[in-house]
Each structure stands twice: as C-alpha cells, then as structure tokens.
Amino acid sequence: MSRLAPRYEWALLGLITAGAAVLRLVGIGHVAPDPFYDAAVRSMGLSWHNFFFGAFEPAASVSIDKPPVDLWLQVASAKLLGFSSTTLKLPEVFAGIAAVPLLYLAVRRMWSGTAALAAAFALAVLPVEVITSRSDTMDGVMMLLIVLALLLIVRACETGGSAWLLAAAATLGLAFNVKLLESFVALPGLAVFAYLGLPGRPRRRLLQLGAASAVYVAVALSWLTATLLVPAHDRPYAIGSSNGSAWNAAFVFNGTERLGGKSPEPQFTVYEPGRHYPEATQSERDRIPIVPPSATRLLARIGPLSGQRFGLELLVALLLGIPALVSGLRQSGYGEDDAQGKAHARMRRAVAGGLGVWVLTGIVLFSDMARLHPRYLEALAPAVAAMLGIGAAWAASARGRLRGAVLAGTLVVVAIYAERLLYGAPIAWWVTLAGALGGIALAVLARLPSVPEGVRSVLAPAGVLVATLIAVAAVPLHADITSIRTHVTDAGYVGALPIEEQRLVSAYLRAHQGRARYEVAALSATQIGSLVVQDARPIVILTSYNARVFTSIAKLRHLIAQGKVRYAFLNSNCAGHLSSGNAACSAPARWVRAHGTDVSAQAGLSRGKVLWLLPGAPA
C-alpha cells in the first residue's frame, strides 16, 4: 500500500476538514458556556497555584473534580485572546477539527485511502462530536489524543520500533489526565491492536507492551502524584471527593460512582417507554433524559443521545464494518510468504482485533452506564468512524455479490431507521432515500457484465461510495444544522444563574462589600459559577458534593467576626422529602436562614430567601 496519497485525496481531505471546521466554528459565540469549568478557568488565570491545581474560586479553597490539563489550554487561550465564552471553546473546536485529518492518516496506513476519506468524513459530521467540540468541555481534547495515539500505534506496527509505541502510551496517559476513566474505553482495543500488529515473537511484543504500560502509568498518574508533593494545607479540597483528595475524586467520584451512581443533575420530563414524541420540537426531545441502560440504548429515537446524533453511524459501522474486517482477515491481498505480505496480513489482524474490541468495549460500557452524557461517547467516536469508513469502502468495491447484498441490506435499514428517527419524511429523509436508492442502483450496475470495464471498476464503485455516504450522512448533517441553529451544547449548566439575577447580585455585593475578603458565602460550588466568572472574587464554599459540609458553622462565624464575609447566597430551598444530600438542608444553610437577614428584595431580586446578610455582619 502506497504511503503517499494522490493529490486528489489531499484535496478531498482538505474539503472534509474545511467542512468540519465550518460545523464546529459557526455561531460558537451563541453556545451557552459551562459556568462550573469557566469559573475554574477564570480563577486559574489569577495565580500559578490556582493554575496547577485547577482552583474553582480565586481563593483556591476548592478545586475541580478532575486534573486541569485541558483547562490549562483554555487558560492559555483566554490569556492570549481575552476571556470570553468563545475563546474558552477554541481548544475544543480545534481539537475536533484536527482529529479529522489525523484519523485519515491512521486509517490510510492501516487500510486504504478510500476508507480513510470515508472515515474522516464520518467523524467530521458525527453530531455527538460536533456538539461536543462546540462546547467548553474536556472530551474533544481527549478524543484528539486518542486518535493521535492510534496513529502512533499504527506507525509502531509498521516499523516495529518501540519509540512509536512509547509515544502512544504517553499520549494515552495525557488523555487520562484530560478525562480520566472515560479514556479507558479505547485502552483494551488499542492494546490488542498493538499486540496483533507489532512484528516479532510474542515475548518481544509483550515486553514492548510492558514498557508502554509503565510509561502510560507514569504519565497518567503524574499530576495526581505531583499534588501529593504539596503540603495538605496548601492543596484545595477536590470537589466530588469524600475526603478532599484529588485521587478520591478521580477514581471514586469520576470512576466507580459514574458506573453505578444516580446522576445528581436535574432531570426533565421522565422518559416513558413506548410513548411517541412526533409533536415535540428537537430541543424539547433533547430535554428528555437519556434512555435508561439497555442493549438498544445507543439507538434510541429521542433524547440528547438519539440515533440522529450517534446511533445511525454506529449501526452502519457495525453492519458494514464487521463483514469488512472479517473479509480483510481472510484476504490479506499479498502473498503470505514475503515480508510485505506478512506485514499486510498482520496489520489487517490488528485492525480487526483492535477496532472490534474498542467498539465492543464502548457499546457494553455505555449501554449499561448509569450516569451517561453524550460527550462521553467521544472515546468511542474514532473507532466508529474508522469502522464505518472501512466498511463503506469495502462494500462499494465492485468485487463479489456478497458485498453488494450487504450494502443493499444496510442501505435499506438506514432508510427505515432514518424515517423513524426523523418522525416523518422531511427533506433529510428524502436525501437519505435518494442516496440509498442511488447506491443500490450503482452497485447493481457495477456488477453487470455488459457494462464497460472502466465504468464497472472505477466510476461505479466511486459512485456507490458517494451515494452510500450521502445516505448515511443526511440525518447526522440534519442534526448538526439543527444543533447549530438552536445553539445546542453538551456542557453542563451547573452554577448558571439567570443573567439579570446575576447582574443584580453582583452589583449589590460590590456596593455593600466593604473590606470583606470574600464576595459571598455560597451554598455550593455548583450554584455560584456564573458569579465567579463575572467578578473573579474569592467565595466561601459552604458544602461540597452530596451536601458534605465544607465550611462549618463555627468557621463561618469566625470569618464573619473577622469581617471577611458579610453575605450568603442560597440558591435553593430545603424541601423535607429532599433533605438527604440536599445542600440547602445542610447545617450551615439552616443556620444562615435561621439567623441571617433576607436582603433579596433590597438587591432587586424577584424572589426571596436567596441573598442573606449574615448574622453579626455590619449592615
């Protein structure tokens, strides 16, 4: 297989990458920010101490629940271009764009140029990836690092050199530092890929993988280990942890609890199996919680993880990719007796085993995961796009009736599934249908003996591939355009305040602050992010995750007596049936309501019992 792509491939890749850039850049200034992580970026830009630990608020009493590696990029962007919602999203945007040509390079080396272009196109238009890249979350950067690691492993398999493999391991270690256990989804598949694809005897390959594992662990745990070198009293309390430890937050809060825990975030209309939602707008369907764990969860018709955004491409990747990988195992394409033939056969085995395990791991995990967000599928997206590209290129070939039958069956399934996803027959479905019918017709044409050889061997297969990609991409592109038009984000709203309320609270606190060090005592970090973003002033955090008391009543009274804090912001009420795990029902919150003075009306707020003058603080 030639390693130098023809000019037309580079031109097509340029068009695909440009399209990916358009989908990720248009209107990103209108996409809602993530107040929680944006507050951390704001605080991290104030000092090197805050920068290293990922401090949530300027005084660095608490830190975010993850290593702040991705946020370091956002801080750099804000320092260079100014702090804004747009500049904070740029690292994610460019990560999503860069992943497209990187995936092309990887798939071209391990399969073919045609498959690589199809894979790059599939990733470029995948709605889950587009939406995540337009949001200021960490997942896009993690995905880019995983794709880079895949490319490095492919190079290691080609050359047999350990340096490429060790570089891949270090890259995956960085991916762990960006999004922790989410990056584990790719690990089993990439390990299988490396073992099957590396040349040499099994013992040598195992030794290489052992060395790579050591590098991975060293890089993955580097930040967590570095935090232990700082005295405990100088380390912020890690939000989400049960003991303030960043290790606990990483492996418990973001590990075991994610697999089986109940999401603490507010839910909207409860999903009802069997209910039809044709009358709902797409934005209303997005507010329906993700379908509960099940074998068909990733193919759901509704919700923020509907088949429009991921399931359709996943289905095509399975229907076309599996037979393509199996066929690749049976037909290496070269004589097995020469070195080139052995290398080719070895790469095909690595692709089949590695991508198969990667996709299987992701499907099993995300189908059963209790607390699932669409952005988590970034760890699976490259494998799905690669399998789809390989499968589409294989099926579009003019060779064999089996390929034509598989392609025709897949396109029929795509047309039926697309109609169900779109709740009727809008333009996107007609495009899907036209692409499916065109692909089937051209596949039949390519296999007619009366058709000239040039048409059968070149033009018809190219047309089949284009028609197939049109059929597959119509629904995802429809979802992309809808998400751009409606400013969909996959970032959280934790810490968001109504804009007018935020303005009034900020103005009142500035006018009545005096010389207090802390702007306000907040019920929790999850309620005050917007104010930190706007004012960048220290905050007293009363409770951590699950209403664990972080600032005791005695400590709060001490701060009041010292004149360091005068006001409290309690953005929720204590309902009796929700008292367990509710920060509004914590001891500090009850004490503020019992002894403080409600000044919400004086601040101009439309609701009461939100802003409080603390007892003992001068009026």
Region locations from a protein language model:
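A glycine-rich phosphate-binding loop feature that marks nucleotide/adenosyl-phosphate handling sites
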Residues: L319, V464, A525-Q527
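Membrane-integral, polyisoprenol-dependent glycosyltransferases
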Residues: M1-Y417, Y423, A496, Y545-A547
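Short periplasmic/luminal acceptor-recognition loop of GT-C membrane glycosyltransferases, typified by
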Residues: T17, I470-R548, R557-P615
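Transmembrane helical bundles and short interhelical boundary loops of multi-pass, membrane-embedded
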Residues: A398-I499, R503
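Extracytoplasmic/secreted proteins, especially bacterial periplasmic and envelope-associated proteins
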Residues: F36, A40, P68-V75, S245, ...
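Extracellular low-complexity, O-glycosylation-prone Ser/Thr/Pro/Gly-rich "stalks"
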Residues: G161, G439-S450, G454, R593-H595, ...
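Active-site lining segments that contact anionic ligands and/or coordinate catalytic metals
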Residues: W247, T361, P374, R403, ...
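Composition- and surface-driven signal marking solvent-exposed, interaction-prone regions
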Residues: L377-A381, G391-A395, R399, R456-V466, ...
